[in-house]
């Protein structure tokens, strides 16, 4: 406590970010302040050099303050810089008492560029510099389904570069394009098609009606497989915005955020209204053992969503909960980022209050649907058994694969919300000379990416205590808090045999080893994760090996033998790099002379 007391007596009055640590130097919390001295001292009461929590703070904060042993600060130029740095560090370091919202992606927009002679609908996530561009969105899902439908229903120019070819392609032959490249349609006639396209984007019901007619025609002609494609597409487009029955007389452009939470679970709902209609919506489920602060959750949600330059900005942002201080901070952040003054408002009456109530109703409904399942019970049992600080709601699992230290690869699979999240899987080509070096490289590369993709609650490593220690060292170097376990086969004659049916799995933690019965559901849960990572890494290794064998065969055809191929691979690192290298560079590696 002497270190903490000394730090509290020497605080700066400047803007910056503060970090609280416990006695083991584990990061507890990251915050930002316009005046660091004033903000940090608001957490504590100091009497006769004794530090206690400020009783005016919440019970959650008081519980955290009791654990604080050290604090560190980072000074920045102004409060805006502090806000951005705080958000970045929370994502990267995942402190115990901060709320981490993972949904920080930029949603896609559909746009049409009417400055061109023959405009077509395309997808973008950024602002385009051309004049005459009309945007629609954001779409939290279904943008590609809408786009595919438009191209199939209307005789639009099918590709961006079609006009330059000056020759009609197969789309003209199958009556999917009017071939403006050969002047078979005038600009004025094509503009009518483009305007019909606009109507379908703006009026989802009209688009769905046309798709249903197409589906019915296909079914009548016994083309059932094609009809099923349209059925699935209609279903996806219908789910884009479940609130489209809301149609206000006033043509509001609004973004709506509602937060609802109890105990260790919460839901954040986002709704996007354009021209008085809800066009899309999304939600995020959040879990935390240490409770929630609605103000903090809302702040992170707003920063995540508006940190990128967006094609369409709302007139107002509606929230269901936020302190006046945070509202002011966020308004300044958005103005600083987008050079546009947008009001953040907590409505008290009228249409806008009705919108917030709809968002809240949906948040509560989503919250109530997520009842305690067998999976959640197992997660809690796993946490208790392995003495984890957090329930492992999001898990990343790692495995490597190689053959005689060649074609070395690694795989990361992700498990969240009771399912494997295949869109988050990652594959890595590795250079390590042995399995330990390969695992170290794999984990280091993942840790270096924490700023872009925040760390999970838990890492599961396919390996023993050596691999576990490699993971712990990697995380220590990164400064991020992630709990780690490893799972391996028991050793026989000092060797681990994965293929031996009788060999039992052992779970390793930092301080303990667990040998559970094969029927134990906690072991089976960890095994399920390990098996998926092993399958993913093995499959990637096999595909890499096949690809490399083809590349070796091609090089042999060029008169390069296997020994020379090995030299080239050792030097250039990959077959792709060998292909790009000049003959002079290859000869230099092989020490050939002209």
Swiss-Prot record:
Positions of the GIY-YIG domain: 13-99
Record keyword Cytoplasm present: yes
GO molecular function: DNA binding; excinuclease ABC activity
One BP term from GO: SOS response
Disulfide partners: none
Keywords, comma-separated and alphabetical: Cytoplasm, DNA damage, DNA excision, DNA repair, Excision nuclease, SOS response
Subcellular location(s) of the protein: Cytoplasm
Listed name of the protein: UvrABC system protein C
Source organism: Helicobacter acinonychis (strain Sheeba)
Lineage, top ranks: Bacteria, Pseudomonadati, Campylobacterota, Epsilonproteobacteria, Campylobacterales
